[in-house]
């Protein structure tokens, strides 16, 4: 009798184990189907630089004093942010160190930062336009930002130390290979974008010709407060 009971108990345990395995497989299959449906049915992110689109990610190196370090734009945004929530707005400034308009705008950029830098994250993307005489370098980017002596700014027509404005105390991002410029369909420099904390383009200077970026930031930030 004991032997028979042992056999029956063993068989019962085996059936129980089989049931648990089958149940686990079934649940896993259901979860897989759900995840696939969510992935297929979820609308893809509308990525671009027009107002209302999610700004393309930026992966490069940034200089904020000291040494260059890895940088990724999406590390600075909150995809879960919604209107009314607290969050960091982002101001992207596209320049070329050989661009005379960018050089002359140095004072305005300092003014924007002095006015909004405590509430808005500033990032300058330093690219190289495909124009004769435009040949920059990481050294020139650093000297443009920090106002170091370097006669290479403004297509070798000006010293970086004489750039209008103060040294810029925010990160400068390397785009000498023009990857970011291509992703952003850069129309020229200077070019500006204001992003809401979730990375959505709230203001595009190309869509608002003649509007001062500082006035735009003031208007949008005031409306979102």
Locate predicted features.
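Short pre-active-site segment immediately N-terminal to redox-active cysteine/selenocysteine motifs
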Residues: 87-90, 95-98, 129, 188
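Structural microenvironment flanking redox-active thiols in thiol-disulfide oxidoreductases
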Residues: 103-163, 176-183
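A short beta-strand-turn-helix
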Residues: 59-90, 114
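Conserved beta-strand and immediately adjacent loop positions that scaffold enzyme active sites
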Residues: 57, 91, 191
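N-terminal targeting signals for export/organelle localization
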Residues: 1-71, 225
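The canonical Cys-X-X-Cys-His
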Residues: 99-103, 192
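PAS/PAS-like sensory domain loop/N-cap motif
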Residues: 74-76, 99, 199
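Thiol/disulfide oxidoreductase modules built on the thioredoxin-like
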Residues: 87, 164-169, 174-221
């Amino acid at each position: 009798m004991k032997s028979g009971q042992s056999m029956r108990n063993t068989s019962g345990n085996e059936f129980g184990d089989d049931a648990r395995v089958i149940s686990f497989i079934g649940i896993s299959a259901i979860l897989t189907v759900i995840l696939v449906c969510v992935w297929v049915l979820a609308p893809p992110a509308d990525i671009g630089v027009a107002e209302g689109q999610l700004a393309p990610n930026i992966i490069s190196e940034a200089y904020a004093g000291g040494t260059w370090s890895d940088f990724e734009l999406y590390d600075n945004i909150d995809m879960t942010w919604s209107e009314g929530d607290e969050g960091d707005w982002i101001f992207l400034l596209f320049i070329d160190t050989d661009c005379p308009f960018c050089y002359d705008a140095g004072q305005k950029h300092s003014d924007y930062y002095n006015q909004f830098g405590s509430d808005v994250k500033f990032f300058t993307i330093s690219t190289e336009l495909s124009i004769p005489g435009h040949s920059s370098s990481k050294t020139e980017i650093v000297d443009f930002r920090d106002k170091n002596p370097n006669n290479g700014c403004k297509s070798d027509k000006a010293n970086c130390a004489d750039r209008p404005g103060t040294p810029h105390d925010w990160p400068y991002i390397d785009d000498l290979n023009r990857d970011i410029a291509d992703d952003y369909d850069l129309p020229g420099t200077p070019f500006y974008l204001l992003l809401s904390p979730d990375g959505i383009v709230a203001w595009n200077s190309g869509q608002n010709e003649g509007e001062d970026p500082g006035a735009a930031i003031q208007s949008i930030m005031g409306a979102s407060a």
